[in-house]
Amino acid sequence: EKAGYEVLVFHATGAGGRAMESLIEDGLVAGVLDLTTTEWADEHVGGILAAGPTRLESAARNGVPAVIAPGCLDMVNFGPRDTIPEKFADRLFYEHNPQITLMRTTAEECAELGCILSEKANLSTGPVDVLFPTEAISVISASGQPFHDPTADQALLEAIKTNLRKDIRLHEIPTTINDVEFSRIAAETLLDFLQVETTESV
């Protein structure tokens, strides 16, 4: 906002991701901070807050500058505990509230999600960077928290490293995703992209 942009916030609820993708597709968005990509965990694993298989594609295909992070890819969203499919019975869960139960993604699922995130970023026709917060990708994946799983997080990171297009920068940031420093770096990266876009269009 200090740089003169109107900032819109979209919650990663499935509907939120679809709404954001639609606005980007309509040409109403100058740049995207796509930091909470958790809807892909629901899409891939089978949660209730998926945004569809084209999530992460609108900015890429339309050349809109973007900064992408794997925010909350450690979790899949379900409703009350008794509504969770039986096939997930042995998994690690965290009850966020009586209506929402979160399930930890496994290392294998994280590797698959890293491939998907990379594939979507690789579609980009405009400037894009990927930021990876190495200390935690969510509040509850930090050290001492219930979803702390360095092996799964490393599988996610390695899959992104392996599959990301070589001309797309991957920044490993030694913070949690909610640290002020991470937010600053993400915002400055996007503003740098937008500055270049503005300069080139003059």
Regions found by a protein language model. Name each.
Residues 87-96:
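Active-site gating loops and adjacent loop-to-helix segments of metal-dependent hydrolytic enzymes
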Residues 74, 95-101:
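Conserved anion-binding
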